Amino acid sequence: MSLQRLSALRALMASQPTALAAYIIPTADAHNSEYIAPVDARREWISGFTGSAGTAVVTSSSALVWTDGRYYTQFEKEADLSLWTLMKQSLPDTPTMEKWLATHLAEGATVGADPHTMTREEWTPLQTALTKAKMNLVAVPTNLVDEARVQLGDPPPARPHHALIPLPRKYTGKPAGQKIKELREKMAEKRAAALVITALDEVAYTLNLRGSDIEFNPVFFSYLVITPSSTYLFWGDGTIPEEARKQLEDEDAEVEGRPYGDIVAFLQQLALAEAGDGQSSIWLSSDASEAIHRAAAGRDVLEKPLNLTSEVSPVALMKLIKNDIELEGFRQCHIRDGIAVVRFFRWLHEQLDAGEEITEIQASDKLLEFRKDERDFMGPSFDTIPGAGPNGAIIHYKPSREGPQTVIKRDDMFLLDSGGQYKDGTTDITRTRHMSYSPTDEQKSAFTRVLKGQIMVGSALFPKGVKGNVLDSFARKALWDVGLDYAHGTGHGVGHFLNVHEGPAGVSWRPYPHDPGLKPGQVLSNEPGYYKVGEFGIRHEDLVETVAITKDSEHPRAKYLVGDYDGRGILGFNTITMVPNQRESIDVSLLDDFELKYINDYHDRVYNTLGPILATRALIEDKDWLERECAPITRK
């Protein structure tokens, strides 16, 4: 099947007005979304690789995918390796896509791509590199993978257009009209005639609306354009439903609906209108697509295209700092989510102890049942990763519902990464447990070293404004001490009933390109790991909120403070995830006294928070199980 698809694509490449020597197929959709709808799953369709990150390149004789360390094992399982080559992104011996194209194509070659699926930040350096190599990059007006699908009788599904969900102020904490007012103030500072918002979560955040067009992400396909006097929502056929319109009006947000497909023509007309001004510009996010940049600059309608303001979106920076209502929502939904996860683990241990066969899929489905019992639950925040035994070493493992199912065994390390979308927040938690409470010495050592790294980040104090990459090595030190590591970042931002992965801040060995620095009110993940391919995987993941710290704060390191970084201010983290780590998998001999107390204090907080709720709900078996799991750990 993959060969047939490649052949169809190659025929289309050869039939272009200027034959294409290579065609680039990114993962992203027209909004640079991490998670995409089936209509946009072009790289998956052509390659068979389902990972959420990666770029495919097809030439007349080669087919390659560049992806990062989270997906190496997954790619080798899913792709036809007789047709596709894995390019292990960021490894020293792996050339970048630009370098590979420059060295493997002939001088004068033309490379094509759909400008809707590449950001301006991706397009420009690629164009520069190819020009330097005396090659051309062209914007192909129609997507060739979509055309290949039609030719093979497998057309892309329709783009979803589901109902809009108004999110009341009791959850958002700030009305849409106030957000638009603040954005207009930012626009005035930039002398911007318009702000073009293309990221789906940014549109949803600004308008206090949610949707369900992309699985796990409560967003809707749309664009938002704000001018000094008007706001335009490009969505569906342009008709804003009555319930959504009423909330917008109640929140002093006057929004005019336009058809989703009209955005390019609208921006071209806007460019024509602004062409004679010379004093103002149009502001786009640097993550907006090349197609949107072309339209806003008027490249196809003006002799001299407009200069654009292209930088990080002000909406991204606004929603990064959660307000008090959003932060309290995060804390409360993590309590409810903790109840669901605790109930699940007690159930799973009970089933396996009784000799029942439980597959990874069955476990995932049961966890969803428990989450559905909790107030304001709207669905999972991503596809649950239930990695039993060697599957836990596949960082973004996804079991198939078709074919043989993996049974969770009592001698397995079981890595469970899952999360929920609630109206008052988003959760993302990973816990790793040995299903018979008897891990090997190697597993205990790895488990404990990963936990030590998580504690080092979770208990860290640092100056306000420090970027996340500074903290990344904290999480790795205990692993590095014995020559171990993990091939992913340590933390990502999390949206408020929005995308579980939210920029522009994060904690990774590689700096986030637009990281504004750590500030109070951010919510991030703290998730070091270790993966022994073919045997087991370990990851501990909590969500933390960034908080201001003084000597009087209830923080385990506050009492040691003697300064405030020369007036810069002190920050730390408060862990909001509420699920214990498995005591039996901890090698106490590897812990210092601070770490041991940190774990016991955390478990005490978890039990004192969740225990009374379980008792009130008459979930006595769950309460008793939690009490045992949170019992103090002592040195023998």
Name what the model sees in each region:
Residues M1-K636:
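Active-site neighborhoods and metal-handling regions in enzymes and metal-associated proteins
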